[in-house]
Amino acid sequence: MGTLTDRLKAYAQSDMYPLHMPGHKRNLTWNINPYDYDITEIDGFDDLHEPAGILKDLTERVNRLYKARESYILVNGSTSGIMAAVSAAVRPGERILIARNSHKSAYNAIFVRQIRAEYIYPHTDGAGIAGEIMPEDIERQYCEFSDIKAVFITSPTYEGVVSDIRRIADIVHSHGGVLIVDCAHGAHFGIGDKFPSNPVTEGADIVIMSLHKTLPAFTQTAVLCVGSGRVDSRVIKKYTDIYMSTSPSYLLTASV
């Protein structure tokens, strides 16, 4: 059977084109020895949990790219960002409206925080593929549960279906709620004019994106972008710290 290293080496040397994540597609442009870049928080290299120098500059560049108020670089994937967003926006015992096609990390956050969940279903086509979340369905849920604190949806879906974030955000905000968008497969949205707008600029309050899925960054890299002040930034930071490793990889961070 051989070792995992043997199998990875054989795959890398094959003529197989990687039609899968990560987005760098085994690009050899950044041909480095990973051990040279694998360090810890030493003088001059900042701290991802308390960025004040070179990593603060990186987060500010992410802010400019996505037009976000604040951004958090993540090396535990969108999983940690989703759990942080849900935890920051909804207190234990409060209610969240969550789309049934959501990533399991959102459900894990609901379980860990003991949040009350209500569900909304995406429209499906004849092939059974999950489609968009309809704004009217969210309005109906608010009519039934007026105490919904946050709405969690996925846009784009794994199949590339995009919901009307602007209309959904307007509805959620009119009821005093927070809109969290899992945009894990849409980190390229808003970059140039050939892609849909990013949810940050469409009114979403917290957006989580996996840089490694569609952009040339290493697996596990992601960002949490804040689009408004509806959730206390100190609380968001607290939960990103809780859910992310205290030994963040500089190799992963550098690939951002």
What does each of the following model-derived ranges do?
Residues K25, G77-S78:
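Short glycine-rich, polar/acidic loop-and-turn segments at beta strand-coil junctions
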